[in-house]
Each structure stands twice: as structure tokens, then as C-alpha cells.
Amino acid sequence: MRALIQRVSHASVTVDGVVVGQTGPGLLVLVCAMAGDGEAQADQLAAKIARLRIFKDEAGKMNRSVLDIGGAALVVSQFTLAADTRSGNRPGFSSAAPPAEGERIYEYFAAQLAAQGVPVETGRFGADMKVELLNDGPVTIWMDI
């Protein structure tokens, strides 16, 4: 699985003019299931993100997790994270999981992150979404599992 994790002051996702998910201080997690991914990868990614220490402690060091700060996560599917740009000028996405499997793994991942104790809201898989965020730091982490 592939994820782009952003520490945010707030974030929201809108579909057809309606906010379908939002968070205050916490994480925006853009996530892509890759071909061959399954529940094991989703479990590992959820556990890692829940404990990822990218929030400042009292000394100003990145030493606290989203769980430690009582934050939440907005999880948004984004198959374009699978882009292959090595050849030509048009990205290829053949390394992404097929849509039905990608949706299943995406939903499973969001549920597993919530099971770790992180309040989770989500976007809508496959929809044309508008994502707004205020990146805090900025802190942006690329993660492959």
C-alpha cells in the first residue's frame, strides 16, 4: 500500500458540493491500494500511521503521534499515487489495485485505522472529490508498505 500523510490543522473532502468528511488537528491520509495488496498490508499501514510520531512535544520535537494528541484522520482514496512516470509524459496506473479490490482494501484500511483508536472520517471511493487542507509545518510523509 502507498500513502501520503500530511499533518494538518484541518482538512475536508467535498463531493458534489457536500462535505462528506473532515477533521480538525490530525492527519490527512491519501491512500492507494497497489496490485497484490491485501489485509496484511492495510493492517501494517494502519498500525504505523496511528503511531507515527510527527506531532511536536513540549520541547518542539516531533515526538507525538495522532493518538498522543487526541487527533483524528481524514482518509481519502487516491489511485494516482500509483502513477508510473518513468516513460513518456502520461502517467500509467497499472500498478494500482483493480477498482473493486482497491475499494475493499481502502475501506478495510480506514476501519483498521479506527480500530487503532484514531477517529476516522473518509472521502468517497471513486468520486470526483475536492480536498481542502491546511498543512501544519508543513509535514508530509510518503509511505510504502
UniProtKB/Swiss-Prot annotation:
It catalyses: glycyl-tRNA(Ala) + H2O = tRNA(Ala) + glycine + H(+); a D-aminoacyl-tRNA + H2O = a tRNA + a D-alpha-amino acid + H(+). Belongs to the DTD family. Its EC number is 3.1.1.96. It comes from Ruegeria pomeroyi (strain ATCC 700808 / DSM 15171 / DSS-3) (Silicibacter pomeroyi). This is D-aminoacyl-tRNA deacylase. InterPro entries: Daa-tRNA_deacyls_DTD, DTD-like_sf. GO terms for molecular function: D-tyrosyl-tRNA(Tyr) deacylase activity; Gly-tRNA(Ala) deacylase activity; Ser(Gly)-tRNA(Ala) hydrolase activity; tRNA binding. The keyword Protein biosynthesis does not apply. An aminoacyl-tRNA editing enzyme that deacylates mischarged D-aminoacyl-tRNAs. Also deacylates mischarged glycyl-tRNA(Ala), protecting cells against glycine mischarging by AlaRS. Acts via tRNA-based rather than protein-based catalysis; rejects L-amino acids rather than detecting D-amino acids in the active site. By recycling D-aminoacyl-tRNA to D-amino acids and free tRNA molecules, this enzyme counteracts the toxicity associated with the formation of D-aminoacyl-tRNA entities in vivo and helps enforce protein L-homochirality. Keywords: Cytoplasm, Hydrolase, RNA-binding, tRNA-binding. A motif (Gly-cisPro motif, important for rejection of L-amino acids) lies at residues 137-138. It is found in: Cytoplasm. GO terms for biological process: D-amino acid catabolic process. A Gly-cisPro motif from one monomer fits into the active site of the other monomer to allow specific chiral rejection of L-amino acids. Homodimer. PANTHER family: D-AMINOACYL-TRNA DEACYLASE 1 (PTHR10472:SF5), D-TYROSYL-TRNA TYR DEACYLASE (PTHR10472). Pfam families: Tyr_Deacylase. Its main location: cytoplasm. GO terms for cellular component: cytoplasm. It is an enzyme of class 3 (hydrolase). The lineage of its organism: Bacteria, Pseudomonadati, Pseudomonadota, Alphaproteobacteria, Rhodobacterales.
